[in-house]
Design a protein with these regions (language model features):
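Short alpha-helical
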Residues: 12-13, 40, 72
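Local sequence-structure signature of Cys/Sec-based thiol-disulfide redox active-site neighborhoods
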Residues: 1-23, 27
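ATP/adenylate-binding site constellation spanning eukaryotic-like Ser/Thr protein kinases
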Residues: 8, 38, 50
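Non-catalytic, surface beta->alpha helical segment in thiol-disulfide oxidoreductase systems
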Residues: 58-82
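Structural micro-motif
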Residues: 48-56
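Generic recognition of short, well-ordered alpha-helical segments
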Residues: 15-19, 47-48, 68
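Thiol-based oxidoreductase modules, predominantly thioredoxin-like and allied folds used
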Residues: 30-42
Length: 82
């Protein structure tokens, strides 16, 4: 399982989203986690079709834009990992 978090350096809420995801993923070390600057990866942003950050992509599919709900993200991780 791979989680990508797209952010922009000037985004005021991105640090909160990063912190939430990283804290949750401490319980799931088998999950690959990558943070990507949306400006530097505009091809992926266009491909995935989002226009705001933070954006969370799980296994190549856009899952959420904005600060994620911790319980919903945990449920998604558990459901994906099986």
């Amino acid at each position: 399982m791979k989680i990508e978090l797209f952010y922009n350096p000037g985004c005021p809420i991105c640090p909160k989203a990063k912190k939430l995801v990283k804290k949750l993923l401490r319980k799931y070390p088998q999950v690959e986690y990558v943070e990507l600057n949306a400006f530097e990866h505009q091809d992926r942003v266009i491909q995935l079709g989002f226009q705001a950050v933070p954006a969370i992509v799980i296994d190549g599919a856009l899952w959420h834009v904005g600060i994620p709900d911790k319980k919903a993200l945990k449920k998604k991780i558990i459901g994906t990992l099986g």
